[in-house]
Swiss-Prot record:
Organism expressing this protein natively: Thermomicrobium roseum (strain ATCC 27502 / DSM 5159 / P-2)
Record protein name field: Large ribosomal subunit protein bL35
Membership in a protein family: Belongs to the bacterial ribosomal protein bL35 family.
Gene Ontology MF terms: structural constituent of ribosome
Gene that this sequence comes from: rpmI
NCBIfam families from the UniProt entry: rpmI_bact (TIGR00001)
Keyword tRNA processing recorded: no
Keyword Ribosomal protein (UniProt): yes
Amino acid sequence: MPKMKTKRAAAKRFKITGTGKVMRMRHARNHNRLKKAPRVRRSFDKMAPVHPSDVHRVKPLLPYAW
């Protein structure tokens, strides 16, 4: 059986933590950034967890991440 391919677009957008959580970058981080407060801009640099009800959509895209 051939190897499964990782979806490269998903690999660039999601990271898996050591405990198995799926992390994503926050939205609205580039466009009109200077209008936003500094505290909000700093929060864009942190990754946020993917909601547990959406993890099953990400798992098939990253077959070797787990």
